[in-house]
Structures are given as structure tokens and as C-alpha cells.
Swiss-Prot record:
Keywords: Cell membrane, Cytoplasm, GTP-binding, Membrane, Nucleotide-binding, Ribosome biogenesis, RNA-binding, rRNA-binding. This is GTPase Era. Residues 58-61 are annotated as: G3. PANTHER family: GTPASE ERA (PTHR42698), GTPASE ERA, MITOCHONDRIAL (PTHR42698:SF1). An essential GTPase that binds both GDP and GTP, with rapid nucleotide exchange. Plays a role in 16S rRNA processing and 30S ribosomal subunit biogenesis and possibly also in cell cycle regulation and energy metabolism. Its main location: cytoplasm. Residues 201-279 form the KH type-2 domain. It holds the Pfam family KH_2.
């Protein structure tokens, strides 16, 4: 008997949702950064064994939006509640419950689907603090289970995956066993470039960046995959930061991104990077759609 199901990973920004998904999948399919609001699109991670398939949906961190991009991200996250049988509500062990958590809890109560509370980053707290956190959240909602984990170190992750397997119902294999995500390679390439920008820049710059893959094709002569990407920013000053002194920052972004892209594609890559200014793109629906943030996602 084959069993399958869809599982949403929900929570505030920067609680470790993408780290968890990448750990379960055994490879990077979601961007990771210590900066909030790193994930902007819903990303599917397809975990398949001989007898089960769990389709995880990693969602953007739920926050109070300040831009049209923020609205897109939050609606994209909440829309997954209509698509799944189970929700993993992830919270950090090293932060007390806040207004953002309470807002999510109210939406989860209204959705009326089983919710597993996942308390992440347990490696950062004393067991007594963890027990307090468990008691506090338990008083807010009737969770199906409460599972403390460390997504970074892998503690208890297998236990959580096994719990999900045990609760699966008989169903179809929705995706082939060798498919690990629903996003095309172009999307993953753009995310890998954006991840390097997130790691290497500060303040407002990371949030003002979109990455568009202009072309991606194999060069018959060199047998390399030739990829051209454009990094979009909102201001000239941000363009200067990303290019860096004598182009040093842009070279660094390209070099680090190329390594990850080559690992993913299993091919040699020639990566060409450009930077363009598109003023206030985060508040323009046409620009959002052009850069891959499309309302069709929800």
C-alpha cells in the first residue's frame, strides 16, 4: 500500500523552515539566510520512499507586510492551508511567543486541520526553557503533537518525519521518485544567486533584490551551461553596493553562486551577472509578476 500527503511548513520569518526542508531533502532546494523574509515563494520539497511520498510546502515567513511583495508573501503562505492535510507550525525555542505567533495561531484554529507544533533551535536553549515554551504554546491551541528539533544539527528531525509517515493515508504517488521540487531549474538558479546577495550584503539591500534568469543554454563549443542573470535593485546606491569596488562584490556573488549551481546541475557553468535599477519594484504588481512573484501562486 502506497501512502502520501501534503504538509505545509508555516511560521514567522527566520525560524528555520527552509533549513528543516533542506535537511529532510538531503540537499539545498530552499534559500537559507540569517536575514528575515528570505523565502519569497512557496517551495515544494518532494520526499519519496518506496512506500510513501510527503510533499512539503515551505512558505514565506508570515509577517506584517509593508509592500506589495510582502502582501504576496503572506497570502502565498496562508493559501497553503487550502492545499494540505497537515501543518507544521514552526517556532524558535530561543524566543518567547509573540504577536506574530498569536496571529498565525488564530488562522490555524480557523483552518481546522491537524497542526504539529515544531519547536526549532533546541540546541540554543536549556531544557527548562524548552519546557516553559512547550507549556506556553500548549495553552494556546490543541496541537496534534509537539516536537522539539534542531533543523541545523538534525536533532529529532527523523522522529518528526517518521511521525508524518505514520499519519499518512493511502494515496497516489503524485510525483516521480527522482523529482525533488516543483520549481524549474531557472527558479533554483535565480534563488542561488539571490542567496549569495543575502549573505554578502546588509541592511535594506537584501530585501530590495530580485534575480531574473535572462537565458540558460548549453554552449556547444565549451560544453558549459551558459547562464545570464540580472540582479534587480531599487536604487542606484544599491547597484553600487552590489557591484562593489572595481566589481569585486559582483565577482564574489557570481563565484559563490556558480559553485552551488554547478553542484545542482552536475555541469560546468559559465555565469554572467548584470545589475539593473528598477525603482520601487516591490510595490509594482507588473514588476512583481515579471520577477516571478505572481498572484497565480495563491
Amino acid at each position: 500500500m502506497f501512502k502520501s500527503g501534503f504538509v505545509a511548513i508555516l511560521g514567522r520569518p527566520n525560524v528555520g523552515k527552509s533549513t528543516f526542508l533542506n535537511h529532510v531533502m538531503g540537499q539545498k532546494i530552499a534559500v537559507m539566510s540569517d536575514k528575515a523574509q528570505t523565502t519569497r515563494n512557496k517551495i515544494m520539497g518532494i520526499y519519496t520512499t518506496e512506500t510513501e511520498q510527503i510533499v512539503f510546502i515551505d512558505t514565506p515567513g508570515i509577517h506584517k507586510p509593508k509592500t506589495a511583495l510582502g502582501d504576496f508573501m503572506v497570502e502565498s503562505a496562508y493559501s497553503t492551508l487550502r492545499e494540505v492535510e497537515t501543518v507544521l507550525f514552526m517556532v524558535p525555542a530561543d524566543e518567547k511567543r509573540g504577536k506574530g505567533d498569536d496571529m498565525i495561531i488564530e488562522r490555524l484554529k480557523a483552518a481546522r486541520i491537524p497542526v504539529i507544533l515544531v519547536i526549532n533551535k533546541i540546541d540554543k536553549v536549556h531544557p527548562d526553557q524548552l519546557l516553559e515554551q512547550i507549556d506556553d504554546f500548549r495553552s494556546q491551541m490543541d496541537f496534534k503533537e509537539i516536537v522539539p528539533i534542531s533543523a541545523l544539527q538534525g536533532n529529532n528531525v527523523e522522529t518528526l518525519v517518521q511521525l508524518l509517515k505514520d499519519n499518512l493515508e493511502e494515496g497516489f504517488q503524485y510525483f516521480p521518485e527522482d523529482q525533488i521540487t516543483d520549481h524549474p531549474e531557472r527558479f533554483l538558479v535565480s534563488e542561488m544567486v539571490r542567496e549569495k546577495v543575502l549573505h554578502l550584503t546588509q541592511q535594506e539591500v537584501p530585501h530590495s533584490v530580485a534575480v531574473v534568469v535572462d537565458s540558460m543554454k548549453r554552449d556547444e563549443v565549451t560544453d558549459k551551461v551558459h547562464i545570464r542573470v540580472t540582479i534587480m535593485v531599487e536604487r542606484d546606491s544599491q547597484k553600487g553596493i552590489i557591484i562593489g569596488k572595481q566589481g569585486a562584490m559582483l565577482k564574489k556573488i557570481g563565484k559563490l553562486a556558480r559553485r552551488d549551481i554547478e553542484l545542482m546541475l552536475g555541469d560546468k557553468v559559465y555565469l554572467e551577472t548584470w545589475v539593473k535599477v528598477k525603482k520601487n519594484w516591490r510595490d509594482k504588481k507588473l514588476d512583481l509578476a515579471d520577477f516571478g512573484y505572481n498572484q497565480k501562486e495563491y
